[in-house]
Amino acid sequence: MKKKLVSIMLVAAMALSVAACGSSKGNSAKTDGTEAMASSVSKTPDNQISINLASEPQTIDPALNSAVDGGCMIVNSFAGLYTYDKDGKLIPQLASDMPEVSDDETVYTVKMIKSQWSNGEEVTANDFVYSWNRAADEKTAADYAYLFDIIARNDDGSLAVEATDDYTLKITLTNPCPYFNDLMAFPTYFPVYQKDVEKADPNGKNPGKWCQEAGFVSNGAYTLKSWKHNESMVYVKNPKYYDADNVTMDEIHIMLSADDTATYAAYNSGDLDFVDTVPNDEISTLNGKNSDFHIIPNLGTYYVGFNVNDPIFDGKTVEQAASMRKAMNLLIDREFIVENVGQTGQIVADSFVPAGMSDGNGGVFKTDDTSYYDADKTGTDQVEEAKKLLESAGYTFTDNGDGSYKCDPAISMTFLTNDDSTHIAVGESLQQDFALLGINMEIKSEDWNVFLEDRKSGNFTIAREGWLADYNDPINMLELFTTDSGNNDMQLGKGDKPSDSAPDWTDYNKLIKEIRTTADFSKRVDLMHQAEDMLMDTGAVMPIYYYNDIYMLKSNIKGIY
């Protein structure tokens, strides 16, 4: 999922196991809203938890969402076939057990428990048949539509998903898939209420309209009671939820704001119980000194990406454009960013697929040999190598006598980011790094939803990026960049008339398709390494560090995992 500043595991905790959350309230600790405290307690009512995750979500439609903040809200409102427990183990949710799998591992049979929508109607296997086909339909234009490519197709183009009775699903895959159970736990695979969807959008022109206001039918632990856009959301316990007896928190109040100074002040005043980001200049004060402040591991990569179709590369060959991007990659001082911006022990990244990710064949994908550059070197260590790459792209340099150079012709660009002190600080670090070779970079910050749309549409030269693994398999990182992926912000292979300087992406698309369809898991690992090689050779993706995550949680809030 597109990364803000909250971990996917913590999303599961806040949205799924907040149902098991309890609190022992006390008097709020006194604070001026800016000082770090040893610990603090909540002043919200006993039956409520108040949190901030982000600003206004772009969508809370399970089929359309591809951001973590939207995902958190979706798992409040909806329940799928499977979920994860506090140890990260996959367990049944609306399924009665783990699926029965055929000997050739291509046919999955899932038995369902009886459960209800929030309006009292039964949730049936046909709800999943409808919802999965809707998410996969090109008319829906879901960023994650490709997650259904592993499912075979019927002659009419529909997914080979059949409701053999009201509570049994039969799913036929194109080939064995080691992570299909995890897909069935992912929000894009959640059911939606067909009548709401079709009533709100009878012509199919606005597929997410049905959930743009509170009051829609859902089947999760909570229903959305109120939504003051760009201000707040209130979720209330759903009495029709299949496990309602174990939902002890009656309400979840969400503050919608990307202003980390304001949300941090609200947290310190006791108005918020949980925040997933703090002002960047507060991290060193909090880390190791405040028991509310937590750092957790994560599986994902923070990176910076180029739009390969941007005019900055006009007139260059494919190789020259790649050399320009690779040169700037070498200039990045990752150690500085980790130590002075991230400040929570992130690991500098020398590959796109993150360290620790499984290879899908019983091993770990990234080894000591899997590095594309020396991430420990600072930009000043690699200025000469970067200069040679830019010279090969047609640029000349004049030594300024202070370790920096003037570039001719001049290179100017704008770094696109959302409003967040950490991302802006990363941009400021890049400004200094690129200036070593006379490259001028401005910083443009936008509201979250505007930023997402501009980045997706290719309205940028260089942008901040991040991806948290949706499941523990490298294909999840690599299939982002296929031509038909809605998450391919780098525009690789995209556009009616791709730039002459953009790489031909045909072979990459074929490679990802082969990875998805091969039944030889050892070969699959080799193919995924080839795909990462091809991706990194474009220079369009510049990994900065492998994620961990931070959050603050009131000391008297219990039961969160």
Each PLM stretch: what is its role?
Residues S96-A142, K170, A266, V318-Q320, ...:
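Aromatic- and charge-enriched surface segment that lines or borders ligand/interaction sites
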Residues A145-K199:
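Surface-exposed binding/hinge segments that line
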Residues H229, G379, A393-A469, F521, ...:
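Ligand/substrate-recognition segments at binding pockets and active sites
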Residues E213, P239-T285, N440-E442:
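Ligand-site clamp/hinge motif
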Residues L5, V348-Y395, D399, D419-H423:
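Structural transition elements
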Residues N52-V101, V217:
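N-terminal lobe/hinge region of extracytoplasmic solute-binding protein
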Residues L331-K366, T422-Q431, R455-Y561:
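Detector for C-terminal structural segments
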Residues K86-K89, A185-V247, E251, S269, ...:
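Gly/Pro-rich hinge or "lid" segments in bacterial periplasmic/extracellular proteins
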